[in-house]
Amino acid sequence: MKLLYLGSQWSKHGYNKTTIETLGHQLEQEGFGIYCASDKKLFSLRILDMMRSVIRYRKQVTYILIDTYSTKAFWYAFVCSQLARVLNIKYIPILHGGNLPNRLKNNPKLCQMVFANAHKNVAPSGYLKQAFENAGFTNVVHIPNSIEIDKYKLKTRVELTPKLLWVRAFASIYNPEMAVKVLFELQKKYPNATLTMV
């Protein structure tokens, strides 16, 4: 089976690997044929490259996987999903944006066009799955983000000192205050718990 995976491939520009680069590679290892787009940095070039890929590979692929976020990158998912519908290609949004529940509330018609017509919507968290189900979507499956657990050794601790690391932006949509509240609660049981926010 061949798949087209649409997302941001930015590691060649010096950024960390994204889901399309890690999951795409894992799917290849499982025997799937994978076409990917896009490594373009500029918004307009990236959306054009994604659209071109949908048209180019329309007869070769069974499904299109679309990394779907809640803010500006939502438009990639919207445009490419609608193009896939016109071309009669099944597509699967992979939900990443923690602010997607607000997108569901603020843009219900656009979201209906994308998510109700998807073959499946993949939620990596129970939070997003529940939010989509609460919004009336029945085609949502929970598939947690993958992690190669064998790369991480278990460190047995006699005394636990939690060290939290926040690696998201400080924008309000990511709710950075929640990390501080979690630290406050942890310090009730583990007074030496720390939080680093980068």
What do the predicted segments below correspond to?
Residues T68-A73, I89-K105, H119-K120:
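A short, histidine- and acid-enriched strand-loop-helix "catalytic/donor-clamping" loop
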Residues Y15-L23, Y76, M178, V182:
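Conserved alpha-helical elements of sugar-nucleotide-dependent glycosyltransferases
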Residues G24, S81, L183-Q187:
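A conserved amphipathic alpha-helix that caps or lines the catalytic cleft of carbohydrate-
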Residues A116-K153, I173:
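Donor nucleotide-sugar binding/catalytic pocket of nucleotide-sugar-dependent glycosyltransferases
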Residues M1-D39:
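N-terminal subdomain of nucleotide-sugar transferases
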Residues Q82, V86-L87, L104-K120:
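Membrane-proximal helix-turn-helix segments that form the acceptor-binding/catalytic region
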Residues G31-R56, L65-A77:
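A short, charged, and often flexible helix/loop element on the N-terminal side
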